Amino acid sequence: MKLLAIDSSILTNTSVSRQLTRSFVSRWQKIYPETEVVYRDLHAQPINHLSQKILAANSVPSTQISAEIREEMNLSMQLISELLSASVLVIGAPMYNFSIPSQLKSWIDRIVIAGKTFKYVDGKVQGLATGKRAYILSSRGGFYNAEPALNLDHQERYLTSILNFIGISDITFIRAEGVNVGEEIRTQSLHQAEAKIQQLLQFQMA
């Protein structure tokens, strides 16, 4: 079994989402010690945003592609391979300005590729990254799980939509909300998220 773990927070020691991904992966490995973990830190090793040159490279002769762009194309194929070969996807995704970090968006733009992770059949989209479970470790400074703030959530809704689009429908969100409201709420929210991780993985063992 292969697990692909991704961190996207620009914070390091104080990151809530990183704390949760570490906890999740550590607990998972104790249950499934044979798991091969592939880890990507999108802040420490950022992926360049998709550019016109990278996009156009798929439709020009290879002799016309520069070494720099060829390296970018190879990276895209590596990212897609990491995703498709994984049975489990774990993403640390903090909410930034009601959405996701640009670092995570760069990764998404590299793996959502026609003919690789989705295709069109009779005019309808068919995801090709099927048979996977996704766990999203979500952190939010405020509370966005109820009206009226619910309408400001372009983080979890977007991630659900894009993963569904490429064929991943088994998605579980584990969130820590209100982490910037106050220290007491932050601690309580983290404890609740950790408890949910433990509960989920205990259920996996049953």
From Swiss-Prot:
GO terms for molecular function: electron transfer activity; FMN binding; oxidoreductase activity, acting on NAD(P)H as acceptor; oxidoreductase activity, acting on NAD(P)H, quinone or similar compound as acceptor. Homodimer. This is FMN-dependent NADH:quinone oxidoreductase. Quinone reductase that provides resistance to thiol-specific stress caused by electrophilic quinones. Binds 1 FMN per subunit. InterPro entries: Flavodoxin_fold (IPR003680), Flavoprotein-like_sf (IPR029039), FMN-dep_NADH:Q_OxRdtase_AzoR1 (IPR050104), NADH:quinone_OxRdtase_FMN_depd (IPR023048). The keyword Lipid metabolism does not apply. Coiled coil: none annotated. FMN binds at S9, S15, V16, S17, M95, Y96, N97, F98, S139, R140, G141, G142. Keywords: Flavoprotein, FMN, NAD, Oxidoreductase.
